[in-house]
Amino acid sequence: MATSAKESAVAELTDLFRESSAAVLTEYRGLTVTELKQLRDSIRQDATYAVAKNTLAEIAAKDAGLEGLEAHLSGPTAIAFVTGDPVNVAKALRDFAKDHEKLVLKGGYMDGQPLDEAGIKKLADLESREVLLAKFAGAMKGSMSKAAALFQAPLSKTVRTVEALRAAQGEAA
């Protein structure tokens, strides 16, 4: 690869690292072109999947201010640059790796922090952002209903007491 081509590749990878909220490094040795296309299609909505030379990826990661990825840059490496939901991408990669043993999850980073293979799998075990938001909204709605009932109880009790006093005064007169 000519020096200008390498510089261009490093610049492109650096931009991808900077624009992504997370990245997952994988080893794709032994996967067919069709299988790689299936993998790309499964994560297309939330990530870009690109094959990268290890030395160029290491330089680009350092240029982007990311440390700790060099330990995962050995063998044939492809990187999923996540621009959408990292949980969805981690799940898709984990599920694809279960079905295709030749795909190996190496590690990656999220929000600037390095992740190992176990970290990627933990990320994949999380529920999606939408599910977590729905659970949070449900908890908030329940809490608000309880708070409203709590504030209404003294008011309704006071109204019933006043009505009872009026009834008692009406009977006494």
Swiss-Prot record:
Belongs to the universal ribosomal protein uL10 family. GO terms for cellular component: large ribosomal subunit. PROSITE patterns: RIBOSOMAL_L10. Gene3D superfamilies: 3.30.70.1730, 6.10.250.290. GO terms for biological process: translation. This is Large ribosomal subunit protein uL10. It holds the Pfam family Ribosomal_L10. Signal peptide: none annotated. HAMAP family: Ribosomal_uL10 (MF_00362). Keywords: Ribonucleoprotein, Ribosomal protein, RNA-binding, rRNA-binding. Forms part of the ribosomal stalk, playing a central role in the interaction of the ribosome with GTP-bound translation factors. NCBIfam families: PRK00099.1-1. GO terms for molecular function: large ribosomal subunit rRNA binding; structural constituent of ribosome. Part of the ribosomal stalk of the 50S ribosomal subunit. The N-terminus interacts with L11 and the large rRNA to form the base of the stalk. The C-terminus forms an elongated spine to which L12 dimers bind in a sequential fashion forming a multimeric L10(L12)X complex. It comes from the Bacteria. The gene is rplJ.
